[in-house]
C-alpha cells in the first residue's frame, strides 16, 4: 500500500502538468479563435434591433453562412448601419406602428437573424434572387449592401422589396395561410423554383425596378412580378412585398394590364387567335385579383392589419425617408 501511495504521489504532478498543457491559453485552438471586440455599431444594433425586436444581425464575414454554389462576399463596414437604419425605420417600425400591428406585433415570436452581403445573389441563370433559398424563413438575407445609397430611390426599393418579401415568408410561417387554396389559383403556372422561364425576359432588363418591380409580362399571366412564378410561397410574398413599395394606382394599373389581351394594340386578324387572347386575359385578371383579395383577407384575419392602410403608410414613409436624405 505504501508503494502504491508513493506511485500516486509521483504521478499526480504529471497528470496536472498534462491538464495544464491542454488548457494552455496559447494552444493552437485558442490562437485560432478571433477575439471580436464589441463596437459602437454592435451597441447600436443591440439597442435598435436585438432589444426591441429580438433580431440578431450578422455583418461580420462567415463563409459558412453562404450556401453552396453561391458567389457572395462581405459587406463594407461603412454601409452596414445605413442599411440597418433603413430596415428599422421602413421595415420593423412599419409593422409595429400603433395604427397597424402595434408595438407587441413581433414580441413573443421566435427570433430573426439578418445576414448582410456585399453583392447580389444571382442563380445559375443569372437571375437575381431577393432571398437565400437555402436558408429557413427565420433568416433574412440582405444583398447588394455595398451598393446601397439612402439617397437613391432604386437601391432603397430593392432593399425594401427583399426585406418585405422575406418578412412576409416568416410571418406566413408563424401565422399560416391556407396554402392549398392559394396554390390552386395559379397552380399550373408555377415553375417549382426554376428560373428557366423568367431568365430570358429578365436578361433584357437593366434597372432594379425593371428586374424586381411590377411587370407587364407577369401581369398578363396573373402575377405581380417575374419572381412570383417560382412558387406559391414566392407569389404570396411578392404580392405583400410589391404592394408595400407601390402606390395603389400602380397596383391598379398592374391589374388593368392583367385584363389586357396580348393583341390589344393590334387585334389579330384570325378570330380564333383574337378570342384566345381575350380568354387568356380574362383568366389572368381573374387570378391576379383573386390572389390579391386572398392576401388582403389573410393579413386582415391573421395580422389584424388593414393592408391598404399599411400600404399607404409604407409609401408615405418611404417618400419622407428619401426627402430627409
List the model feature ranges, each with a label.
Residues 93-118, 174-183, 250-260, 303-314:
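Surface-exposed patches in mature extracellular/periplasmic domains of secreted proteins
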Residues 2-9:
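Sec-dependent signal peptide recognition
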Residues 81-139:
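Auxiliary, metal-adjacent structural segments of Zn-dependent hydrolase domains
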Residues 19-107, 285-325:
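Acidic/polar, low-complexity intrinsically disordered N-terminal segments immediately downstream
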Residues 69-78, 145-158, 222-230, 281:
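Second-shell loop/turn segments in exported
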Residues 153-181, 237:
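Active-site recognition of the HExxH zinc-binding catalytic motif
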Amino acid at each position: 500500500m505504501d508503494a502504491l501511495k508513493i506511485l500516486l504521489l509521483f504521478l499526480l504532478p504529471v497528470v496536472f502538468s498534462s491538464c495544464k498543457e491542454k488548457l494552455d491559453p496559447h494552444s493552437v485552438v485558442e490562437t485560432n479563435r478571433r477575439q471580436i471586440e464589441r463596437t459602437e455599431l454592435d451597441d447600436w444594433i443591440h439597442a435598435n434591433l436585438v432589444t426591441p425586436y429580438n433580431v440578431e444581425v450578422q455583418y461580420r464575414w462567415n463563409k459558412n453562412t453562404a450556401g453552396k454554389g453561391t458567389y457572395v462576399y462581405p459587406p463594407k463596414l461603412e454601409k452596414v448601419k445605413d442599411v440597418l437604419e433603413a430596415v428599422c425605420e421602413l421595415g420593423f417600425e412599419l409593422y409595429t406602428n400603433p395604427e397597424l400591428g402595434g408595438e407587441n406585433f413581433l414580441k413573443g415570436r421566435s427570433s430573426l437573424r439578418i445576414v448582410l452581403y456585399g453583392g447580389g445573389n444571382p442563380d445559375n441563370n443569372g437571375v437575381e434572387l431577393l432571398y437565400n433559398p437555402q436558408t429557413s424563413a427565420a433568416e433574412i438575407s440582405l444583398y447588394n449592401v455595398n451598393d446601397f445609397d439612402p439617397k437613391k430611390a432604386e437601391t432603397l426599393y430593392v432593399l425594401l422589396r427583399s426585406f418585405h418579401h422575406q418578412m412576409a415568408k416568416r410571418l406566413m410561417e408563424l401565422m399560416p395561410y391556407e396554402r392549398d387554396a392559394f396554390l390552386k389559383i395559379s397552380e399550373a403556372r408555377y415553375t417549382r423554383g426554376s428560373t428557366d422561364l423568367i431568365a430570358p425576359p429578365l436578361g433584357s432588363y437593366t434597372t432594379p425596378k425593371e428586374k424586381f418591380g411590377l411587370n407587364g409580362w407577369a401581369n398578363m399571366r396573373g402575377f405581380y412580378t417575374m419572381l412570383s412564378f417560382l412558387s406559391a410561397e414566392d407569389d404570396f410574398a411578392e404580392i405583400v412585398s410589391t404592394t408595400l413599395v407601390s402606390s395603389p394606382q400602380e397596383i391598379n394599373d398592374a391589374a388593368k394590364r392583367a385584363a389586357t389581351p396580348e393583341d390589344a394594340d393590334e387585334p389579330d386578324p384570325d378570330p380564333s387567335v383574337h378570342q384566345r387572347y381575350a380568354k387568356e386575359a380574362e383568366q389572368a385578371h381573374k387570378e391576379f385579383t383573386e390572389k390579391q383579395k386572398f392576401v388582403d383577407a389573410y393579413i386582415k384575419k391573421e395580422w389584424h392589419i388593414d393592408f391598404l392602410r399599411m400600404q399607404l403608410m409604407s409609401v408615405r414613409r418611404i417618400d419622407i425617408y428619401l426627402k430627409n436624405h
